[in-house]
Amino acid sequence: MSAFLNIPANFTSPKAGSSGEKEAEKSEEADGTGEQARTAESAMTEENDGGDMDIKTVKIEKPEALNLILGHSHFIKTVEDIYETMVNTVPGAKFGLAFCESSGPCLVRYSGTDDDLVELATKNAYALSAGHSFILLMKDMFPINVLNAVKNVPEVCRIFCATANPVEVLVAETEQGRGIIGVIDGFKSKGIESEADI
């Protein structure tokens, strides 16, 4: 093994508390660098301590058959660009869109072609209050009709889910704000398919 690694046969690995380590520690103590490093590390730990975090479950309110897309973006122009994408991809599309700002006035911005869906999307977005998240509710159409187009909107960073299932959103809340950490899309598995199920 030592020949393979090209390690001299008389090589001895340093052990914890060896004289070399002790000399280095003495040197650090003598010039104060050891204490400075510990102080800096302690200060960094205090600065990075964001305080407590709570995880909440927010249930999306919607009629059973209504489809939704829940995502994360990065710019206020999200509302305008997703709106344009929807009307250009599916002529006559009925949808409501809402987006949570994460800076400035931190308002819920909204748009759409169906007043009821806009109101419902706005209500759900405000319940989430997760910075830069958006929710798109659509009627008489499916996410598959628009999902790739929505993904290609420059402001869109990711999609959490696209579904008609009941959705629960796991939201982390700190003193600073809220963020989506995951979703529960529908129900847990009840078994494994058999030949009869195929």
Each model region followed by its residue ranges:
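Short, Lys/Arg-enriched N-terminal segments with co-localized hydrophobic residues
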Residues: A40-D52
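N-terminal, charge-rich interaction modules
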Residues: D52-S111, D197-I198
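Helix-rich interaction surfaces within compact, conserved domain-sized segments
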Residues: N67, N124-A130, M141-I198
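Gly/Ser/Thr-rich loops at beta-strand to alpha-helix junctions
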Residues: H74-K77, S103-G104, T113-D115, K139-I144, ...
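General beta-strand structural signal in soluble alpha/beta enzymes
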Residues: F95-F99, M138, R158-C161
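Aromatic-anchored, charged helix-turn/loop surface patch used as a conserved interaction hotspot
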Residues: F99-I135
